[in-house]
Amino acid sequence: MEQLPEDQGPQREPYNEWTLEILEELKREAVRHFPRDWLHQLGQHIYTTYGDTWAGVEAIIRILQQLLFIHYRIGCHHSRIGININQQRRRRNGANRS
């Protein structure tokens, strides 16, 4: 016979609080890597498409995650993620000059 699972630890924070925290973190990171005007236009597109709904919040989270992932994968010039450090040092030391 099936039984309900026992209470396993503290209650997780509500989904909407967690979702808004994630959105704020992604927005802060996106502003460091993309033009504000471009992000504003993206926000306007999401608002026009979804209105002021949770579906819109989830959509913009998904899009920002994908954009930041691709940005880092290609090789962000704002961080060391995706950059070959040896190439970076050679350029700084002038080793690539002919």
From Swiss-Prot:
Species per Swiss-Prot/TrEMBL record: Simian immunodeficiency virus (isolate MB66) (SIV-cpz)
HAMAP family on file: HIV_VPR
UniProt region (Homooligomerization), positions on chain: 1-42
UniProt-recorded name of the protein: Protein Vpr
Biological classification of the source: Viruses, Riboviria, Pararnavirae, Artverviricota, Revtraviricetes
Gene Ontology BP annotations: DNA-templated transcription; monoatomic ion transmembrane transport; protein homooligomerization; regulation of DNA-templated transcription; symbiont entry into host cell; symbiont-mediated activation of host apoptosis; symbiont-mediated arrest of host cell cycle during G2/M transition; viral penetration into host nucleus
One Gene Ontology cellular component: virion component
Listed InterPro entries: RetroV_VpR/X
Record-annotated disulphide pairs: none
Cell compartment(s), UniProt: Virion; Host nucleus; Host extracellular space
Transport is among the record's keywords: yes
Functional summary from the UniProt entry: During virus replication, may deplete host UNG protein, and incude G2-M cell cycle arrest. Acts by targeting specific host proteins for degradation by the 26S proteasome, through association with the cellular CUL4A-DDB1 E3 ligase complex by direct interaction with host VPRPB/DCAF-1. Cell cycle arrest reportedly occurs within hours of infection and is not blocked by antiviral agents, suggesting that it is initiated by the VPR carried into the virion. Additionally, VPR induces apoptosis in a cell cycle dependent manner suggesting that these two effects are mechanistically linked.
UniProt PTM comment: Phosphorylated on several residues by host. These phosphorylations regulate VPR activity for the nuclear import of the HIV-1 pre-integration complex.
Subunit structure comment from the entry: Homooligomer, may form homodimer. Interacts with p6-gag region of the Pr55 Gag precursor protein through a (Leu-X-X)4 motif near the C-terminus of the P6gag protein. Interacts with host UNG. May interact with host RAD23A/HHR23A. Interacts with host VPRBP/DCAF1, leading to hijack the CUL4A-RBX1-DDB1-DCAF1/VPRBP complex, mediating ubiquitination of host proteins such as TERT and ZGPAT and arrest of the cell cycle in G2 phase.
Family the entry assigns: Belongs to the HIV-1 VPR protein family.
The entry's keywords: Activator, AIDS, Apoptosis, Cell cycle, Host G2/M cell cycle arrest by virus, Host nucleus, Host-virus interaction, Ion channel, Ion transport, Modulation of host cell cycle by virus, Phosphoprotein, Transcription, Transcription regulation, Transport, Viral penetration into host nucleus, Virion, Virus entry into host cell
Further facts: HIV-1 lineages are divided in three main groups, M (for Major), O (for Outlier), and N (for New, or Non-M, Non-O). The vast majority of strains found worldwide belong to the group M. Group O seems to be endemic to and largely confined to Cameroon and neighboring countries in West Central Africa, where these viruses represent a small minority of HIV-1 strains. The group N is represented by a limited number of isolates from Cameroonian persons. The group M is further subdivided in 9 clades or subtypes (A to D, F to H, J and K).
Modified sites of kind Phosphoserine: S79, S98
Pfam families to which the protein is assigned, alphabetical: VPR
Keyword Mitochondrion: no
